[in-house]
Amino acid sequence: MAKQSMIEREKKRAKMVAKYSAKRAELKKASVDMSLSFEERMEAMDKLAKLPRNASPVRQQNRCRLTGRPHGVYRKFGLSRNMLRQLAMQGDVPGLRKASW
């Protein structure tokens, strides 16, 4: 199980991304808009760079909802491979069963 502080840190990042997403999108759009002058585009890039680092969605890490494990997480289920296997073997994931061919 991951440290509780790491799980909380990811939750904090998710809130930060949601808070700044509209402003980031607006500044990114302005920074590539060729109808604006060079100075205006550079100003938009500067403002974008001054936003908090954790406001960028690329800094988010997918984590298992049950254990907080950062690697081997299936997006469809939000679970790590270990927990997905365990729950599937118990029959707790509807429609999922072990492959056999």
From Swiss-Prot:
One of its GO terms (cellular component) is cytoplasm. Keywords: Ribonucleoprotein, Ribosomal protein, RNA-binding, rRNA-binding. InterPro entries: Ribosomal_uS14 (IPR001209), Ribosomal_uS14_bac/plastid (IPR023036), Ribosomal_uS14_CS (IPR018271). One of its GO terms (molecular function) is structural constituent of ribosome. It comes from the Bacteria. Gene3D superfamilies: 1.10.287.1480. The keyword RNA-binding applies. GO terms for biological process: translation. HAMAP family: Ribosomal_uS14_1. Part of the 30S ribosomal subunit. Contacts proteins S3 and S10. Binds 16S rRNA, required for the assembly of 30S particles and may also be responsible for determining the conformation of the 16S rRNA at the A site. Belongs to the universal ribosomal protein uS14 family. This is Small ribosomal subunit protein uS14. The lineage of its organism: Bacteria, Pseudomonadati, Pseudomonadota, Gammaproteobacteria, Thiotrichales. The gene is rpsN.
